[in-house]
Amino acid sequence: NVLDIYMDCPSRERAGWLFDSYYTAKAEYGLTDKSVVEKAFLENYIKGGNLKNHIGMVSMCYPADVFSGSFVPQWSLWYIYEIYEYVTERHGEIEKEMFRTQVCGIFDYFKDFENEYELLERLDGWNFVEWSKLNDRVFDVSWPTNMLYAAALDRAAELFGISDYAEKSKRLKQTICDMAYNGVIFADRAVRNKNGELVTTDEVSQTAQYYALKFKTVPEGDERFERLKDIILKDRESEFERFGEVEPADVLPGMYIKMELLLKWGAYDRLKQEIKRYFLCMARQTSTLWERKNGKCSLDHGFASYICVLIKRICGE
């Protein structure tokens, strides 16, 4: 899946996609202790990744972008997350200041989509939260998208010392907790009613909870965080069903976020259980790992190499 840049699937998608790169970069560094390909990937984005028709926004994949000119607004936020980890965790060779203008441009772009609560509402482009019903729950306000937005602001604030970003992130997280949290779990979205009021729906999913935990919508140690963490650690997510039908997580990105969390928490037995549950059948069928658990997309996907890093960590390497 790698020649000169990260590719999703060499037989189908010879393009460097954002978001996928977030996990493929972790795999490169985890397997080689280097970020050679990631450096080339990020340099491409610095030099030519900005869209001409949507000032401030970056391409969803570059080079070899799609002819339609469409873009995934959420991927620009994952890009900021990748930049943060490249600089702070992988100690990449590209100086962080090389990213400043582009990162600030992304946030300037999003200002036009902020509503009266500073929440992102009805974003342009191909809104992508997960390969599941969550992708049908992006309007009017996607709570997972706003969790990601708040976290990206926080990362940029830390990276570049921009206090306004940190303050906005804090306000957004509080708003999300006030509007999306029902006392146990977070909802998937809010919609405008006939009076124009923003009302949170009763639609819920596993992945929205993973977003809330990864992006620290509630801080670690907070009772709400610990309650969700305990449910996931003890494999008791069926408890969410008392709030109605719960959309299960798919591989991209729900399962990866969940596995990241289990790794961070040192829950290696649970992590091993999840890897076997979702990926062993893929390996047995095709000797590769897939983009989606139903096998309808790529059956040899680059970001799936992150599983190797998880297995190494389980084995103590």
Task: Provide a role label for each language-model segment.
Residues E13:
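Phosphate-binding glycine-rich loops and their immediate beta-loop-alpha structural context
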Residues N1-I5:
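Mature extracytoplasmic enzyme cores
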Residues G16-E317:
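Active-site core of glycosidic bond-cleaving carbohydrate-active enzymes
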